Amino acid sequence: MSNSFGARWFDENWKPQFDQPEWKKTLQFYVDLMKADGPEGASSNGFNENLALFQQGKCGMWIDATVAASFVSDPKASKVADKVGYALAPDNGLGKRGNWLWAWSLAIPAGTKKADAAEKFVSWATSKHYIELVASKEGWANVPPGTRTSLYNNPEYQKAAPFAKMTLDSINAADPTHPTVKPVPYVGVQFVAIPEFQGLGTTVGQLFSAALAGQSSVDDALKQAQDAATAAMTEGGYIK
């Protein structure tokens, strides 16, 4: 959402930007929207909680990962399977959508003693054979998305997964080097690919969650986020 509002984690010189108006607009809009129309307990809901709400017909709109499409369209698990539509994340009029790029990837540690076995597993788990195996057991709509380009040309998958083309379009449209409206020094759409982000991202997320829960104001949350980001960037040597 912040990208579509033109917000940045840092400017070109790694100066934190939570004190800028774009972040105020983003967080205020989010908090107001969720308080007015979001589910109860939204500040503590994660993927599984929101998935359950959507499948039960208690959440009218859910913006999340493309992998969730197969879950919400499965009539065995979802009460709204025949009522679900799919759309790209919104554009706030500045030329950037609020979508992101994320993947659960398979990697082989350089120091492993069983690299050959690991490589065989990775090759198998991303192979056409595995895709066909999952399809035979769980149905074409439930095969792992985003692992093989050929999947999106498969007529059986296209028929079973009405979200297939939109998923591929979303993947192709993601641009980790230009995530928001203004230039940034980092790579990453919904995260910043630097070591400091793991801790900083958690801190900022908790601050924003507290604002949604009514434990702090939007202004206070942004000030604390700015302070935390400034401290992290100073300690990391990005700024003085």
Model-derived features with residue positions:
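Short hydrophobic/charged patches on amphipathic alpha-helices used for structural packing
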Residues: N48-L51, Q55
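Extracytoplasmic/periplasmic solute-binding protein
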Residues: M1-P16, E22-W23, C59
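Short, well-structured alpha-helical segments that form the helix of a local strand-helix-strand
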Residues: F54, V218-A231
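C-terminal lobe and pocket-closing loops
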Residues: V67-A81, N92-T202, K240
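Solvent-exposed, amphipathic alpha-helical segments
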Residues: G199-G214
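Short amphipathic alpha-helical coupling segments at ligand-binding clamshell hinges
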Residues: E22-F29, K113-A125, D220-Q224
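Glycine-centered hinge/linker elements that transmit conformational signals in sensory
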Residues: N13-S44, G85, A89-P90
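Alpha-to-beta junction loops
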Residues: Q56-A65
